[in-house]
Amino acid sequence: MLLRMALCLTVSTILCAGFASNLMDILRRPVNQVWDMFEESHLPAGIGLDAWSKAKEMATAMTSLGASQRALFLRQVSPSQADLTEAALVLRGAQPLPEDRKQVFIREGSPSTAVRDLAEALYSKGAVLADGTGRGALKMMSAFQPGEAFMLTIKLSLYAGVVISFPLLLYFLLQFIIPGLLEHERKLLYKCMAVGFGLFLAGTLFCYFIVLPRVLTFFYTYSLEFGISNEWRIGYYLSFATQMILMFGLAFELPVVVMPFVKLGVLTYDMMKSTRRYAIVAIAVLAAVITPTPDVATMMLMAVPMYALYEICIILAWMHERKEAARTREEIARFEEDFNNNNSPYNQ
């Protein structure tokens, strides 16, 4: 069993290592979203992030050009993009001035009314003036040891291999008890494995697309409030993100843990319904431990889906008991019918 699990994990890790660069891009996506959301929140309505990023890049290129060359340069783009580029130039020119003189420079130094209005709107929103999209502010690729990048690739491939080979690993793990199960118990186990992988995948995707960007945004803005630059090391971020994603995947396994006990009669609908308040407390504590941020909103992103899954378990337990009760009534009715028709062995 252990040998099969080791071989399965080794093969999946080697396969994932061939796509390490793609996996790294996928894992970096939430970080890029953090900066995009931060920069978009500092732009006036009607100005897109791509247009503003292009305007800043063009403004940087124009600093080394003469007046005639600048005019020729701006004629190569649309009038709206040209106005936005000149607004970026005005804002950068005002940047080293005292706060009480910046607005004066913006108002009097703008070449046209349209540029002045754009510059004032951008200034009032606190638009980010760094070149490009500003994602370089998050130094994600810093490595401080010669073999750190290689070890990160191995670690990332291992985490991805665990996710991909999860059904097989679970199957090999359960092979120890499968021979001792009855036929209906085996069928139940296989169903639980299929549902478990689906829930595990749903939990990881939920964390990746919804929870992780929110958590990173919280840490990013929290650091800025204290004047701390966000220079996140790739190794720390990789461990943080992968562990959080895997924890969410495991947390979504709640129905797989509960329903077998319901099927075996250990847990009942009445028992789960009467202990709902204790389940809520346990889920809240677990969510507070797993989520790394202290804010309630992020904790609720973990607690609400888990509680919804618990309620689904209660409904499934109720449906299971109704089904079993109907089956029992049907068997009793069949027995009574056989008894009345003298087909029962007790009448012979």
UniProtKB/Swiss-Prot annotation:
Protein location: Cell membrane
Family annotation (InterPro entries): TatC
Tagged with keyword Mitochondrion: no
Entry GO CC: TAT protein transport complex
A GO biological-process term: protein transport by the Tat complex
Entry GO MF terms: proton motive force dependent protein transmembrane transporter activity
Membrane topology: Multi-pass membrane protein
Keywords: Cell membrane, Membrane, Protein transport, Translocation, Transmembrane, Transmembrane helix, Transport
Transmembrane segments: 7-27, 162-182, 192-212, 244-264, 278-298, 299-319
Keyword Transmembrane helix found: yes
A Pfam family this chain is assigned to: TatC
Function: Part of the twin-arginine translocation (Tat) system that transports large folded proteins containing a characteristic twin-arginine motif in their signal peptide across membranes.
Annotated PANTHER family: SEC-INDEPENDENT PROTEIN TRANSLOCASE PROTEIN TATC (PTHR30371), SEC-INDEPENDENT PROTEIN TRANSLOCASE PROTEIN TATC, CHLOROPLASTIC-RELATED (PTHR30371:SF0)
Protein family per UniProt: Belongs to the TatC family.
Subunit structure: Forms a complex with TatA.
UniProt-recorded name of the protein: Sec-independent protein translocase protein TatC
UniProt source species: Akkermansia muciniphila (strain ATCC BAA-835 / DSM 22959 / JCM 33894 / BCRC 81048 / CCUG 64013 / CIP 107961 / Muc)
